[in-house]
Amino acid sequence: MTAEQSVNTFAIRPATPADVTHIMSMIRELAVFEKLEHMVVATDALLHEGLFGERPSCEALIGEADGEVVSYALYFHNFSTFLTKKGLYLEDLYVRQAHRGKGFGNRMLKHLARIAVERQCGRFEWSVLDWNMPAINFYKSMGAEILPDWRICRVSGEPLTALAQA
């Protein structure tokens, strides 16, 4: 299907183990877009364990256009002490380049918002790179507030091990 062809159906469904390869492919595409491909150490096996292992740590949705996998959203629950409620955190939302501008990202976000409301979450939140103005503008158009005073703090790899042993 070319970008010019119209899409007759767009369906959102929970990911299944058979989708892991599709999701990993899109994770790599997203990393290239975000100029972070050097950071991807994920494998199909590790993703499968995270999504479908004995104790899953995340969930995923798949977006299909006319039966073709064209998008995914990966999310998990966090917790707000201020609200004393769980929240829904969107780790990734990705729509393949050829399928952008068709409203699929909009539909995926709305679907996730419904999940958050159904699960009585106090928040639905995610991060966005500060240079990704198309995404920032899209999220603002959906009602998201971009929090200017917050920064992500991350400890991983050797610094994480050192901190744990300190």
Provide a role label for each language-model segment:
Residues 50-62:
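A short helix-loop-beta-strand connector motif used in the catalytic cores of GNAT acetyltransferases and
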Residues 106, 110, 118, 130-149, ...:
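Conserved active-site alpha-helix within GNAT-family acetyltransferase domains
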